[in-house]
Design a protein with these regions (language model features):
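A conserved mid-protein helix/loop that constitutes part of the nucleotide-sugar donor-binding site
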Residues: 19-24, 178, 182-201, 218-222, ...
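Short His-centered aromatic/hydrophobic patch
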Residues: 91-97, 114
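Short hydrophobic beta-strand element within catalytic cores of glycosyltransferases
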Residues: 276-280
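Conserved acidic donor-binding segment of nucleotide-sugar-dependent glycosyltransferases
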Residues: 292-293, 297-304, 313-318
């Protein structure tokens, strides 16, 4: 009897859109002949908060490592043990699993997900093109860029929007101060240090919203210090998915001043609940959801005044707020329903045998330094690097 094929999602175990993306695809899958696994990687050297919320997979595995000081080959050998040889698909969301599949044959097709309109993901696609069988992304902008970078692989590039739950309960109008929400990682690349300045600009023009910040991250303490003049900001920390979804019902506006994005999960989840987005005007995928002035606003990146002006306009014109609330919910419900979109992914997984390409004869690992050699014991590499770091 042949082994049952398995789809293995490998992803970083930290707060962010990648975790939510995988959660949605696992939660809404239908029986299809595959078993499903999640391998969550976490580098002890990262400053990000790990996630303890379970994923709805048949196998949910945590894989811990420390790079540096470990030998990358030793780390990859351990990672390979979490993905036994067999038929199916590896869904790669980060660099470490692509490094693994570049030198280790798992028997599975490798589908690489491009999560952002940024060099990090495009460079991964180009670097590992010989061992990636399918490139998947979810916005027109990112698909177009992949085709430009990989003109010989156009038939292997798939545009598959993902979806979110469309809740029955949506936000309801409430008189009083505007209820403004930020959801996501608290890190500089998300533009979170713009939030105190946006708030101060709003207060300068007589708008005093109620602020909620949901999430954690490496820059949380610094952000709290930068916003110390506002004692009533509600810091909700890192919550599980169900709590976050309920939170949307009690807010009016989602503020996302990101510097770079793909198509943020928080944007779709908030939009599905009727929370109006005020989000950086990034070409990556934001315009596919937010038509400025209709289903939200898209201020230019880093333009504090434009963000404040958009929020103030919604505060002063509650009729406009409600119209935009209905418009963004309609967009998300029509185009980004999780049940429909997950079925598209499952159909692609079902083609894994046809999409799987021959592996290169002499694969090479494109990571590491002189100490990262397969024949050097991990304990020796750790000792050398720890000694060097103390000098």
């Amino acid at each position: 009897m042949s082994a049952r094929p398995e789809v293995v999602y490998v992803l970083p175990n930290k707060l962010g859109g990648v975790f939510s993306y995988v959660h949605q695809l696992l939660a809404h899958r239908r029986p299809d002949g595959f078993s499903y696994a999640a391998v969550r990687t976490q580098n002890a050297r990262d400053r990000d908060h790990n996630i303890f919320e379970p994923l709805p997979a048949d196998r949910d595995v945590r894989f811990e490592y420390s790079l540096p000081p470990e030998n990358v080959h030793a780390v990859l050998r351990r990672l390979a043990l979490t993905i036994p040889f067999g038929p199916g698909v590896i869904v790669a969301n980060d660099w470490i699993e692509l490094a693994l599949t570049s030198i280790h044959d798992t028997g599975r097709a490798v589908f690489a997900i491009n999560h952002g309109d940024m060099d990090f993901y495009y460079n991964l696609a180009v670097r590992h093109q010989e061992t990636i069988d399918a490139f998947v992304t979810y916005t027109e902008q990112m698909a177009r860029r992949l085709r430009e970078l990989l003109p010989d692989r156009e038939e292997s590039i798939f545009l598959l929007p993902y979806g979110v739950d469309i809740p029955r309960a949506v936000r309801q109008p409430k008189p009083g101060p505007l209820r403004v929400l930020y959801v996501g990682r608290l890190s500089r690349d998300k533009g979170v240090f713009d939030l105190p300045f946006i708030d101060r600009r709003l207060r300068d023009v007589g708008v005093n919203p109620v602020w909620t910040v949901q999430g954690g991250g490496p820059d949380e303490d610094e952000l709290r210090t930068a916003w110390a003049d506002r004692l009533d900001v509600r810091w909700f920390g890192q919550r599980d998915k169900a709590d976050v979804l309920r939170m949307y019902e009690h807010h009016d506006v989602l503020v996302m001043p990101s510097r770079q994005e793909g198509l943020p999960v928080a944007l779709l989840e908030a939009g599905a609940a009727g929370v109006v987005p005020v989000v950086s005007d990034l070409a990556s995928g934001i315009p596919e959801v937010v038509e400025s002035g209709v289903s939200g606003y898209r201020p230019a990146v880093g333009q504090i005044g434009a963000f404040a002006e958009a929020i103030a306009a919604l505060d002063r014109d509650r009729t406009r707020l409600e119209a935009m609330s209905g418009a963004v919910r309609d967009v998300v419900a029509t185009r980004f329903n999780a049940i429909q979109r997950t079925a598209d992914y499952q159909r692609l997984f079902g083609r894994w045998r046809d999409l799987k390409r021959p592996r290169p004869k002499n694969p090479k690992l494109r990571y590491g330094s002189r100490l990262d050699k397969p024949w050097i014991p991990n304990i020796a590499v750790r000792l050398i690097r720890s000694t060097m770091s103390r000098r």
